[in-house]
């Protein structure tokens, strides 16, 4: 579970923080469709990358809702990804130009995107080189499936 990621982060002197949107008592709960095992796999791949490419600062996991989706956003203070590489990071064997010294074949994001697309969800990336990245996992809510 999450503990192993906390330990990996701690080994690099990084903290993983959680933030959620505070719900008012009257707010209806949001129901989203996802497969727990595969969703954790997708989130895990993103966390692994965040830890691998962040040397100072930390990682924040935020729960939010956006239009008809429930989302989990993972923000890091890592090396960031240039705009021209955004599409490529989801490729099957991608490893960034800036990360030649790191080990491992980048199948993680390819798999994460594939997993998210199964229930009709998606992944969004926003990033600034040298400042960090945010990967958003968007899960369809109950309303979407009725459309």
Residue map of PLM features:
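Short conserved segment of the HATPase_c
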Residues: 81-93
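Short helix-loop "hinge" at the ATP-lid/N-box region of the Bergerat-fold HATPase_c
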Residues: 50-51
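Short beta-strand/loop element within the Bergerat-fold HATPase_c
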Residues: 58-68
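Conserved micro-motifs of the catalytic ATP-binding
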Residues: 27-34
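Short alpha-helical Gxxx[C/S/T] motif in the catalytic ATP-binding
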Residues: 108-112
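Glycine-rich G1-box
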Residues: 7, 79-80
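Conserved glycine-rich
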Residues: 120-121
């Amino acid at each position: 579970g999450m503990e192993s990621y906390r330990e990996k982060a701690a080994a690099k002197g990084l903290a993983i923080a959680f933030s959620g949107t505070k719900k008012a008592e009257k707010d209806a709960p949001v129901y989203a469709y996802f497969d727990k095992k595969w969703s954790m796999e997708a989130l895990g791949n993103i966390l692994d990358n965040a830890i691998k490419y962040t040397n100072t600062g930390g990682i924040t996991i935020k729960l939010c809702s956006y239009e008809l989706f429930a989302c989990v956003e993972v923000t890091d203070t890592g090396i960031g990804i240039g705009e021209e590489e955004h599409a490529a990071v989801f490729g099957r064997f991608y490893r960034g130009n800036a990360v030649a010294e790191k080990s491992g074949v980048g199948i993680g994001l390819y798999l994460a995107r594939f997993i998210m697309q199964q229930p009709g969800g998606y992944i969004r990336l926003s990033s600034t080189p040298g400042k960090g990245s945010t990967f958003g996992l968007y899960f369809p809510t109950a309303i979407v499936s009725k459309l």
